[in-house]
Amino acid sequence: MKTYEEINNKISKKEAVVLTAEEVIDYVDRKGISKAAKEVDVVTTATFGPMCSSGCFINFGHSKPKIRITEGWLDDVSIYCGIAAVDAYLGATQLRHNDPANMYYPGEFRFGGGHVMEKLVKGEQVQLFGLSYGTDDYPRREIRTWITMEDLNQVTMVNPRNCYQNYNAAVNLSKKPVYTYLGILKPEMKNLTYCSAGQLSPLLNDPYYQTIGVGSAVWLAGSKGHVYSEGTQHAPVCERTEEGYPKEGAGTLAVTADMKKMIPKYIRGLSLKGYGASLALGVGIPIPIINEQILQWTTVRDEKLFASVIDYSRDYPEKTGKVICHVSYKELKSGKVTINGKEVATGSLSSYSMALEIADLLKDEISKGRFLLNKPYGKIPDNVPFKSLPIKEKANG
C-alpha cells in the first residue's frame, strides 16, 4: 500500500503521521484498520533494559613512539586486543581486574565493561593501560595514559545480541535464594522477575520480521544506527499464539551505532548481585506501515502477549525445557500473578517508562524530519532452528 520511498518523502516534508506502539492501539480502535493504515506512516517501538551481549570497538590512535597493544585495560577492565595495533573491543560484561566475582558469594560486581562505556559516553576520563612484546615497527612495550571519548578516533557500539523478541519470566522453587541475570529470586516462589517492554517491544510489533531486517534504522541510546544481522541465539522457530506472537525468546537483533553520538541517560552500567556486570541500553526501532497486516501487528496489547514462567533454581540451569505456565504481560505489569494457586509478586528489569520515553523521542525525531527509515537489504530469517551445544568426545580421523 505504501513504499519506503513514499514514507521517507513524507518524513522529509515533515508531513508523516507517526504514533508510538502504545498510541496506535486506541487510534486503530477509533478509525478501523483500513482507514488507519492509509493515515499512519510510522509506528515507533522501544525497549530499555539489560543487554549483556553488547560492547564497542575502539581505535585509540597512535602514540609516539608507536605500540601494538596486545593486552589492554580500561579502568582495569580487560579489553580484547587480538586485532590491529590500536584497535580493541570492550565487552559489557567484562569484569575489573582482580574482581573477586563470586568468591565471596553472592558477589557484588561493582564495576565492569558496561560502566566503562557509561563513563566514556558521559565524557569522563578513563585510564588506558596497554602492554606489548614490541616489534621493529611498533617498538613501545608499555603505555599508560588517560583518555576521554573526545580523544578517540572511533568508538563504535557493535552488539551481537540485543532486543530479544520475548523472554522468560523467572521464579525460584528451591528453598534458598537464587542470583541470576534476571535479578534475585526469593525462595519458594516468593517473587517473579521478567524483562520486556511487552506491547512496546520492537520485535513483538513485527513478529515475523517483515519490516525489521538487515539494514533497518535503529535508535541506539540516541545515536542513529542499524541492524547488521540477526542476533546470536536467534531462534524464531518456537511456540507462538494464534496471532503469531512468540511465547518464548524467539528473535534477536545484532545492532551497531556511533557511541560518540549517544546520550548518557540511555546507556548505564549495571551490577547484578551474584551474577555479574552488564549494560542497560535504550533501543528504539521505527516500523513503516506499508500495509494493513503490518499495522495490525503493531496494535497488539499486553493481554495478548505471553511469557513462559521458568524455574531458575533447576529447570533453567539444567536445561530441562520445562515450563511451569504462561502469563500475560498485562498480568506481569499488574504487580502480581497467580501460579498454581499462589499469588506471586512480580518485578521487571526492563523499564516501561523509559521505553515509552524513547518511543516518544523517536516519534519526535521522525516527525521533525530528522530520522529517515532504511529499507532492509536483507531479511531476518524466520525459519532457522536453534542448536544446543553437545558434550562429546573428539571424533577420530
Residue ranges of predicted features:
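Anaerobic metallocofactor- and corrinoid-dependent redox/one-carbon enzyme cores
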Residues: 2-10, 15-397
